[in-house]
């Protein structure tokens, strides 16, 4: 045991993170280097008696498709490598780099119309592989929707507009510019108007684009951290020898209640609507009523149970949202914050 703890390589450097190649007859895996924490990628053909050989770094983007998604006829696959999108031909195994940016493109997928889609931050794009045109589908803004030019509300403000012609003129000019901008966006279809506002101090917990690229399901949560300022632990082993206060997870007793709000966005109509949890069975059930009643009885008190909406959110899993093939229906995995109920909803 002492030898293993002192030198983990002595115990062995077993293959890690293996996955099948596109031909279903090749296996890729990673292996730790001797004496350091770096991992190398290896490939082994099952048709050959030759030992596995290392994949060169210059070719990692070609074989980094373990999480690739195929198109409807399964002739091509799409995946991301180091923030860029690649499309590979399933027959010739030739790959094409679609994006070459410093941004991080993720959630790459094929759409039912033959285009591809991907996400950069909270912005979703559609990319036509034939013409090269990129279309912004949705821009999720964690801010309040701009109110535009407002009329004076207070008595003092109204008097200012009456008595000072310059202020009234500025107000009129601002309204004219705002109206012209609105007319331009409405009448000129080359201008993108895909911003959707979800209020400040919020964050996108999960967002899923439909295979047709015409719908978006978004889960919004508060941006407030689950940790408090006091959730720290001293770290005595640091680079400079100075004791550091490391942020750690919240104490169990201080764990705040957590919930998410679901929104459905019709990208064709440009409409956003909140989804209600009230159709879920037991969404307002007092699931801990027996425990609370027992605790109250211990203190000589009587507990009166009452129905109250529970804190519900998407399950913390890889794919809590699943669309059908044409994007006309969607299924969700939901759970309550109290860990007493889960729902599979459509």
What positions do the PLM features span?
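Beta-propeller folds
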Residues: 1-346
